[in-house]
Design a protein with these regions (language model features):
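Extended, low-polarity transmembrane helix blocks
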Residues: 1-53, 58-70, 83-233
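Transmembrane alpha-helix interface/packing and boundary motifs in multi-pass membrane proteins
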Residues: 75-84
């Protein structure tokens, strides 16, 4: 039987660190998670306008950080216990996709954020196909014939045999696998040049951009942004 606990802890631990161990959801304290969100902006793929809007609107950013953290906590905890595994696997897929597109380019020594994102996507897809295993709450509910497990929707949201025709199931597996393979190669190439050409790492070498330069009454003023490097603002 498969064990989804490591991927579950990956997401639940993010919730635990921000809420239980420290208060990283308070904008007035050091280590506020919203500050780290700035680092995603320069090279985010596909969701850059969303990140830019949130960075420029602190109230909206805070609300989204709270929602994101709560979702991570619920999804992670449910996955660890194997409860409503399939619907939670969709949550894993979505969270991982956000990490991949937003911060997949970040990593000073290895492709750590990219790896977290792409492995989360693959794991979410596999968990949806298989459901949870023997040592899960889903299996406990089914084994003891709880009424909820008799509902048609439980196989889609929980575990058990997927109600997909046997002739169609291989196509679902193939299409999903090809999509994930495509995302793997595409993002690895865009973020790191890992498929062909010259390797690059935009997290290592800092890059500064100077804008709005002007001289007023013999005083020079300008805006400086660090757009590439370990931390960017």
């Amino acid at each position: 039987t498969q064990s989804p606990k490591p991927i579950g802890w990956t997401y639940f631990s993010a919730f635990w660190r921000r809420v239980a161990l420290e208060n990283k959801l308070d904008p007035e304290t050091a280590g506020y998670i919203g500050e780290k969100f700035n680092a995603f902006l320069p090279n985010a793929l596909g969701i850059k306008p969303i990140i830019k809007y949130l960075v420029e609107n602190p109230d909206a950013l805070w609300i989204n950080m709270v929602i994101f953290t709560i979702v991570e906590g619920i999804v992670g905890l449910a996955i660890m216990f194997g409860l409503f595994t399939r619907i939670m696997s969709i949550g894993v897929f979505g969270l991982a996709m956000g990490i991949l597109l937003g911060s997949g380019w970040i990593g000073t020594t290895c492709l750590d954020e990219w790896q977290i994102g792409i492995l989360g996507i693959a794991t979410g897809f596999v968990l949806f196909l298989t459901g949870s295993g023997k040592y899960s709450l889903d299996n406990y509910l089914m084994k003891n014939n709880f009424t909820i497990t008799k509902k048609k929707w439980f196989a889609w949201l929980g575990s058990g045999i997927l109600p997909i025709k046997e002739s169609v199931f291989p196509r679902v597996v193939l299409i999903g696998s090809l999509f994930i393979l495509g995302m793997t190669l595409m993002t690895n190439q865009i973020f790191h040049g890992g498929v062909w050409g010259t390797l690059h790492n935009k997290s290592v070498k800092p890059k500064l951009e100077i804008t709005d330069g002007k001289i007023t009454e013999n005083r020079l003023s300008f805006d400086v942004f660090r757009t590439e490097g370990v931390d960017v603002y």
